[in-house]
Swiss-Prot record:
Keywords: Acyltransferase, Cell shape, Cell wall biogenesis/degradation, Cytoplasm, Magnesium, Metal-binding, Multifunctional enzyme, Nucleotidyltransferase, Peptidoglycan synthesis, Repeat, Transferase. This is Bifunctional protein GlmU. Its EC number is 2.7.7.23, 2.3.1.157. Catalyzes the last two sequential reactions in the de novo biosynthetic pathway for UDP-N-acetylglucosamine (UDP-GlcNAc). The C-terminal domain catalyzes the transfer of acetyl group from acetyl coenzyme A to glucosamine-1-phosphate (GlcN-1-P) to produce N-acetylglucosamine-1-phosphate (GlcNAc-1-P), which is converted into UDP-GlcNAc by the transfer of uridine 5-monophosphate (from uridine 5-triphosphate), a reaction catalyzed by the N-terminal domain. The gene is glmU. It comes from Gloeobacter violaceus (strain ATCC 29082 / PCC 7421). Homotrimer. It is an enzyme of class 2 (transferase). Acetyl-CoA binds at residues 378, 384-385, 421, 437. Its cofactor is Mg(2+). In the N-terminal section; belongs to the N-acetylglucosamine-1-phosphate uridyltransferase family.
Amino acid sequence: MSARLAAIVLAAGKGTRMRSTLPKVLHPLAGSTILERVLAALGELALAECFIVVGQGAELVRGRIARPGVQFVEQTEQRGTGHAVQQVIPHLEGFEGEVLVLNGDAPLLRPSTVAHLVEKHRSFAADATILAARIADPGGYGRVFLDADGRVRQVIEDRDCTEEQRRNDLINGGVYCFRWPALMTVLPALSADNDQGELYLPDALPMLTHVRAVAVEDPQEIFGINDRLQLSQASRILNERTLVGLMLSGVTIVDPLRVTIDETVEIEPDVVIEPETHLRGATRIAGGCRIGPGTLLEDTVVGAGTEILYSVLRRSRVGAHSTIGPYSHLRPGADVGSHCRVGNYVEIKNATIGDHTNAAHLSYVGDASVGERVNFGAGTIVVNYDGKHKHRTEIGDGVRTGANSCLVAPLKLGDGVTVAAGSTVTEDVPCGLVIARSRQVVKPDWKAPYERTEDG
């Protein structure tokens, strides 16, 4: 598309119904934020300029959204959508192209829908083209009124409609494409003569000569978020889109109503996702895996043929054909190799685990480098913290630890070392067997003091 296109995203609203200290547009949604999802809807367009009008929490919005090609314009006093667009006028001086205006709280828009609106606007040679939809319950939305030729005659906010006007089910989707020189001529004439005393952008439409409407195919796309309930509804819609796309691409999702997956997650065909599984962020899962039930993966990479159930993995990596869980916890920096077993109540943090290594139950491995074909006995603990500093442990290939062993860092165990059960190892062991425990003492005639007679 021509680069003579600019976009204005309206993100200055107070969002009072969210009842939050966080700006509404920064609330998390499907792996990003509401505002980032709106910006993603502009992805198919070549924009000359992109402006975000900010108000409430402006610095927070700038901090999260700052990126090349995006400019922030502050609306210090929130006096309506028309007033918000007026704040951009000095930044588009001399601009002769088209301007898209869209709300920053409408995260369900598809890029193809926005691109289609621009294409239709150009084919109409209109002064303005708006996105509209017919919905069963139009309450809360501005109504679009057409003339006999199908052109937009007027858009009236819901609160300003009469009872008869509210029966109109054609609603304003809050997405506009304007010929900027035409809009510039009428913006100063906007009036605050309405119930809220605000300057409404739709009030500019009757002042323009040629205004058209384009119907959106999926009315859900123009869904706006004003409170936590609507945020949850938008989340459910986006999750359904993601799950449908994955299932059509060859992923089995056993119960879609009990699975959530961010659209940023990548899953290859022939993966089975069990119920109560939640996949977040930059997670990538290779083919042939079984994930869940009862599993959370965040920013985690999983190799082919691996099984993970009833476990939590964050910013971790698991190689191919390994088994994780049940009830394992892989914390950031965990890097588990191929053909490994990480079992019941095992926690791994900031540690690399070599191929064919097993930690089957009740172990903690933190800040460690572990070789291949290592076997951790039940209850093996890598003691990495001295109360002030973390220290590393290096464990060579083929090491075996007995049950209830403690490896106190900093420590190095050479290839093939065996640690006897119950040992607390505090010094490096280059090879062989290490036994580091108190000698067992048996007193067969011992009695508790309260059981002893006076004769002893």
